[in-house]
């Protein structure tokens, strides 16, 4: 231990680290890390500064930014030769719509919705779920798009069928680390679902409540597109924590996205923000970026309804090819720029869920990542 470090008490070291962290700013932080009480542990050993943070939402991508921006300052002011960073989670269980009772084992339900089909809602839901898992969370997906259940195909699990360990409940299908269920596991491609709204809604509620979900931090709910009876019924009856609305920059998609936001507001489901999908087409040959569906629409929509633009997702052939193969980009290309974008989206969604919500005491589980 050098003289500089000997002169520092544990309280002094902690104050130095806390002061540096207090200056760190990031889109996922409504308040700074010190105010959030994220600094869990500071220690000194063999000229190495050990810093552990505990966050109430997934934050791994932002954590990498923190290390990059703050390490040099901490080395300079503490005299340490190295820093050992550690991130752990206390994933918070947040208040559900209308204080409904939760689903056994599930902390938070995130509804992914769109006002119309064809905007990439399901692909966004799948990659968001995988990105949340990649950030360190326990995640599940329920495919509520009963008339077009595409999640099994996107996850390469279309040939699997759920089992019932007790004759009453279904065990979820595990795929790429996600616990999943879908009406697509129960019917063949040749059998179209012709149920009316009430029957479809009842079936989906049964799937949600009678699936033996493992302990999940986040359950991503891939909603049916549109704002009709079935969507309204699901939004009213499922204990959702928050909703994400997916759109494209195209004017007609934005019109329908408005309807989705208004629907959630009417049933008192917090809208976490908007995801602008296909915001930029990227040529696979030359890399040229072109906004073929227009620009700026989702940002204006977010401002009008006082919500967040959570992310702008590109349109690239590899994203489609990966889904067609049943190996979404987040798992098949973990180091790609597209995966980085989805992981940043996951951080923003989880953070917005936390900042907009109300923590339910006694429903927080500690877990290191």
Curated annotation (Swiss-Prot):
Phenotype of the disrupted gene, per the record: Mutants are impaired in Fe-S cluster metabolism. They are conditional thiamine auxotrophs and have lower aconitase and succinate dehydrogenase activities.
Effect ascribed to mutating residue 121 to A? Hydrolyzes ATP and can bind an Fe-S cluster, but cluster transfer is compromised
Q: InterPro entries of this UniProt entry?
A: FSCA_dom_sf, Mrp-like_CS, Mrp/NBP35_ATP-bd, NUBPL-like, P-loop_NTPase, YlxH/NBP35
What's an example GO BP annotation here?
iron-sulfur cluster assembly
Q: Which SUPFAM superfamilies match?
A: Fe-S cluster assembly (FSCA) domain-like, P-loop containing nucleoside triphosphate hydrolases
* Pfam families in the record: ParA
The protein depicted here goes by the name: Iron-sulfur cluster carrier protein
- Species for this entry: Salmonella typhimurium (strain LT2 / SGSC1412 / ATCC 700720)
Q: What is the lineage of its organism?
A: Bacteria, Pseudomonadati, Pseudomonadota, Gammaproteobacteria, Enterobacterales
Q: Which gene encodes it?
A: apbC
């Amino acid at each position: 231990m050098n003289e500089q470090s000997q002169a520092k008490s544990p309280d002094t070291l902690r104050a130095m680290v806390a002061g540096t962290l207090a200056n760190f700013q990031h889109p996922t932080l409504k308040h700074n890390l010190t105010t959030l009480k994220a600094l869990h542990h500071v220690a000194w050993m063999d000229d190495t500064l050990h810093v552990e943070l505990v966050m109430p939402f997934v934050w791994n991508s932002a954590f990498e930014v923190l290390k990059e921006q703050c390490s040099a300052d901490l080395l300079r002011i503490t005299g340490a030769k190295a820093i050992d960073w550690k991130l752990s989670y206390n994933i918070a269980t947040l208040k559900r719509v209308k204080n409904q009772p939760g689903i056994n084992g599930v902390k938070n339900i995130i509804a992914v919705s769109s006002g119309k089909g064809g905007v990439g809602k399901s692909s966004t839901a799948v990659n968001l779920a995988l990105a949340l898992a990649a950030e360190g969370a326990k995640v599940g997906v329920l495919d509520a798009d009963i008339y077009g259940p595409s999640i099994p195909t996107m996850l390469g699990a279309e040939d699997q069928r759920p089992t019932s360990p007790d004759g009453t409940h279904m065990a979820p299908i595990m795929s790429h680390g996600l616990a999943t269920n879908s009406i697509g596991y129960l019917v063949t491609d040749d059998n179209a679902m012709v149920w009316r709204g009430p029957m479809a809604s009842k079936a989906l509620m049964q799937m949600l409540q009678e699936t033996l979900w493992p302990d999940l931090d986040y359950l991503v709910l891939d909603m049916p597109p549109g704002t009709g009876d079935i969507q309204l019924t699901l939004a009213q009856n499922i204990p959702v924590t928050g909703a994400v609305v997916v759109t494209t920059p195209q004017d007609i998609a934005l019109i329908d996205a408005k309807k989705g936001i208004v629907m959630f507001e009417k049933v008192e489901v917090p809208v976490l923000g908007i995801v602008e999908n296909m915001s930029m087409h990227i040529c696979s040959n030359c890399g040229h970026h072109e906004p073929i569906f227009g620009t700026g629409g989702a940002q204006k929509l977010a401002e009008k309804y006082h919500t967040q633009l959570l992310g702008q997702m590109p349109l690239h052939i590899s994203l489609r090819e990966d889904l067609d193969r049943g190996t979404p980009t987040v798992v098949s290309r973990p180091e790609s720029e597209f995966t980085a974008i989805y992981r940043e989206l996951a951080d923003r969604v989880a953070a917005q869920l936390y900042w907009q919500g109300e923590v339910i005491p006694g429903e927080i589980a500690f877990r290191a990542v």
